[in-house]
From Swiss-Prot:
Keyword Disulfide bond recorded: yes
Species per Swiss-Prot/TrEMBL record: Human papillomavirus 45
Name used for this protein in its record: Major capsid protein L1
Organism placement in taxonomy: Viruses, Monodnaviria, Shotokuvirae, Cossaviricota, Papovaviricetes
Gene name as annotated: L1
Subunit structure: Self-assembles into homopentamers. The capsid has an icosahedral symmetry and consists of 72 capsomers, with each capsomer being a pentamer of L1. Interacts with the minor capsid protein L2; this interaction is necessary for viral genome encapsidation. Interacts with protein E2; this interaction enhances E2-dependent replication and transcription activation.
Keywords: Capsid protein, Disulfide bond, Host nucleus, Host-virus interaction, Late protein, T=7 icosahedral capsid protein, Viral attachment to host cell, Viral penetration into host cytoplasm, Virion, Virus endocytosis by host, Virus entry into host cell
Length: 539
């Protein structure tokens, strides 16, 4: 006997006393996933090392500058009365960047000892810097900087009653010894610095007088004469400190820059920093606070008010500032006057000098002695000392000497290499007299037959645009080495060090020469002398 059960659109039959198990099958239904779908990242242009397309030769050259000297006032530039912007004495401080722009000769126009080194039809020559030595003259010394009206309120290092209300000028004449810095950055483009500057508020908010300005981190090229970080921070003091007395004279209206090592290390082509040498040290010598109205009021839940009897009813100035100090200076910690060899750069550019130039950024505060000069206002010099009859002057002097070892390299101009160099820097190919054809155009161009006829408009020849120097408006100390290359490495101190380091020997040019030893084959075939034979006489 069977039982019928209606289910949905069908009929299911069950048999009595029979073991039957119905199975219900449901068709699968596809639904889109609710989870986020991540696409693969887009492909990026691959940056290759210069070692992949630059072939190095066995030809090396030495190039060096003459003695480089500079003299000036360590705190400010001296402008004579009525001279306008003309400066009589420039500002020369040990706490300035010295950025040397080294100009090299064009190797493709260079007189080479062997003309078969490269094929000018398919190859180009470039320089690679493999060695460098920065010589520094003058003795080690410490130079002070300060301000005759320095904003120093209380000595917060020792116990002192807090000065709550300041109603008069309490500035003092203070001098400090700055942070100690030794720095050297080598690259084929200028180094990049960073500093904090005054930013802008989002509209419609407006900055009211007395409000704290917003800060913005800016990146700029480090130029010759820019101030380094002296221990007061990398910032624009001219726009962020209106009192002009929070820091010493030489930086109160200047911008102190700090090298942006993060950005230069992340440079995809590695042109701004082949390598760098850095040594910094400082400690806090004195602890002071600043005079003025506190812009940020101390929350009342952070302290318990005192009484007026002990002058602690209201808190005093809580803007604290130390005086930096660079501590002891020794010759054991010197980074200069020693050679450095470049085997592998930190970036993709392994020392190739694009555009035949180098940028050397140097800081050395271990030779910051300021010379004191005094001149009598009377002639002859008074026999009795009177300070009003003598004028005091301060000068700072610096002495440099740059030495380099360059290696001659070749680049085979294949289509792939030229396309890569064009994407990296198209001006390199332009300097090699390679041009990129303009894109095709569909517009008609008018061409007159009689160009000199007065019946038609004047056909002026368009002058080709002049090549613009991208660093024309920037300040650098230019060092021209175009006529100072020499292949006689043994005639220069750095060249002799390079020969020893590279394991190379030079041929003797004078003196007797040893005879060449006989070859093995000649010695084996040569006749040997006969042995002596003794003949005894018969008795």
């Amino acid at each position: 006997m069977a039982h019928n059960i209606i289910y949905g659109h069908g009929i299911i039959i069950f048999l009595k006393n029979v073991n039957v198990f119905p199975i219900f099958l449901q068709m699968a239904l596809w639904r889109p996933s609710d989870s986020t779908v991540y696409l693969p990242p887009p492909s990026v242009a691959r940056v290759v090392s210069t070692d992949d397309y630059v072939s190095r030769t066995s030809i090396f050259y030495h190039a060096g500058s003459s003695r480089l000297l500079t003299v000036g006032n360590p705190y400010f530039r001296v402008v004579p009365n009525g001279a306008g912007n003309k400066q009589a004495v420039p500002k020369v401080s040990a706490y300035q960047y010295r950025v040397f722009r080294v100009a090299l000769p064009d190797p493709n126009k260079f007189g080479l000892p062997d003309s078969t080194i490269y094929n000018p039809e398919t190859q180009r020559l470039v320089w690679a810097c493999v060695g460098m030595e920065i010589g520094r003259g003058q003795p080690l010394g410490i130079g002070l900087s300060g301000h005759p009206f320095y904003n120093k309120l209380d000595d917060t290092e020792s116990a002192h009653a807090a000065t709550a209300v300041i109603t008069q000028d309490v500035r003092d004449n203070v001098s400090v010894d700055y942070k100690q810095t030794q720095l050297c950055i080598l690259g084929c483009v200028p180094a990049i610095g960073e500093h904090w500057a005054k930013g802008t508020l989002c509209k419609p908010a407006q900055l009211q007088p007395g409000d704290c300005p917003p800060l913005e981190l800016k990146n700029t090229i480090i130029e010759d004469g820019d101030m380094v970080d002296t221990g007061y921070g990398a910032m624009d003091f001219s726009t962020l400190q209106d009192t002009k007395c929070e820091v010493p004279l030489d930086i109160c209206q200047s911008i102190c820059k700090y090298p942006d090592y993060l950005q230069m290390s992340a440079d995809p082509y590695g042109d701004s920093m082949f390598f760098c040498l850095r040594r910094e040290q400082l400690f806090a010598r004195h602890f002071w606070n600043r005079a003025g109205v506190m812009g940020d009021t101390v929350p009342t839940d952070l302290y318990i008010k005192g009484t007026s009897a002990n002058m602690r009813e209201t808190p005093g100035s809580c803007v604290y500032s130390p005086s930096p100090s660079g501590s002891i200076i020794t010759s054991d910690s010197q980074l200069f006057n020693k050679p450095y060899w470049l085997h592998k750069a930190q970036g993709h550019n392994n020392g190739i000098c694009w555009h035949n130039q180098l940028f050397v950024t140097v800081v050395d505060t271990t030779r910051s002695t300021n010379l004191t000069l005094c001149a009598s206002t009377q002639n002859p010099v008074p026999s009795t000392y009177d300070p009003t009859k003598f004028k005091q002057y301060s000068r700072h002097v610096e002495e440099y000497d740059l030495q380099f070892i360059f290696q001659l390299c070749t680049i085979t101009l294949t289509a792939e290499v030229m396309s890569y160099i064009h994407s990296m820097n198209s001006s390199i190919l332009e300097n090699w007299n390679f041009g990129v054809p303009p894109p095709p155009t569909t517009s008609l161009v008018d061409t007159y037959r009689f160009v000199q006829s007065v019946a038609v408009t004047c056909q002026k020849d368009t002058t080709p645009p002049e090549k613009q120097d991208p660093y024309d408006k920037l300040k650098f100390w230019t060092v021209d080495l175009k006529e100072k290359f020499s292949s006689d490495l043994d005639q220069y101190p750095l060249g002799r060090k390079f020969l020893v380091q590279a394991g190379l020997r030079r041929r003797p040019t004078i003196g007797p020469r040893k005879r060449p030893a006989a070859s093995t084959s000649t010695a084996s075939t040569a006749s040997r002398p006969a042995k002596r034979v003794r003949i005894r006489s018969k008795k």
